[in-house]
Amino acid sequence: MAKLTYNIPKDYTVIDLETTGTSPAKSEIIEIACLKYRNGEQVEAIQQLVRPRRRISYFIQNFTGITNEMVADAPMIEEVLPAISACLQGETIVGHNVNFDMNFLKAQGVNFDGWYLDTLYLSRKLLKNVSCHKLEYLCDYFGIVDTHHRAASDCLMTNELMYRLASLPEYQKLSAM
């Protein structure tokens, strides 16, 4: 079973998925990104579009910017999972609402029982005066600029958000617990 931490890890992997919906039982992964960091420096990146079995809805195409044409020649999820599993093996996982991503990966047979840090949970603990804790709103709050709803850019923003949250005075109290 995965274990939540609030301590910023020295070595970690930031993950993000783009999917066709919110249910791992009914929806499919259409993009995966894993950015591996050592001592705060990115040392490895996997970004992969994934071809779903069903067409991507117009809503999801507009939301993610990922079209059916973009994934037409992409590998199926079964072809991508070995590299993703290897990238996550033994890592502390960082993500924004990372349980969402881990549940999709678990539904595909990727098991994870290490530590994870969720910037969504961390932001809710530290920014009680902020009403919305979605990644794009928190990035606006901290002045972090990038495109949204693509897996690799969301990983980069999540990584920066983690450090911005850790720089808050309230974080020192939380991490000491």
Which residues does each PLM region occupy?
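Acidic two-metal-ion nuclease catalytic site recognized across multiple nuclease folds
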Residues: 1-7, 159-177
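Conserved non-catalytic scaffold segment of RNase H-like nuclease domains
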Residues: 1-115, 128-149
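Short, contiguous clusters of charged residues that form electrostatic/catalytic patches at enzyme active sites
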Residues: 79-82, 156, 160
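Short, acidic/small-residue loops that bind anionic groups at enzyme active sites
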Residues: 113-123
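Acidic donor-binding loop at a coil-to-helix junction in glycosyltransferase catalytic cores
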Residues: 153
